[in-house]
Amino acid sequence: MSERIPIEILEGYRESFNKQEGRKYPCSNQTVVCGIFTDSRNKAIDFMEDKDIIDIRVMHNEIVWRLRNGEKWIWTNWNESHRGYRFYKVAVDKDVDRKLFENMILVYTSFYCCSFEII
């Protein structure tokens, strides 16, 4: 990760997003999921450790968890295109890259996200 966002700014976004009602269902053809934004596969796995997981799919550059409550959490290489996703809940690495945050996380969480965690 290159230029990082100061933790105070991330905390401000967390406060703002956690006040939103969020939108669990899309208004078009997008898929609404939950995303884990970190370069560390192990950090993503640790974050999901205490969740009520019913299914895990591990592929080369992606892990998908399905939870008993119906949520679908994804960890992947976020530097690739993910245009169809909108994020209802996110877990963001405290060392997240500024460019990734501004060009991916903010764009795909606006109006949908109601839970923003810093990991």
Give the role of each language-model region.
Residues M1-I119:
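Short, flexible loop motifs at catalytic/binding sites
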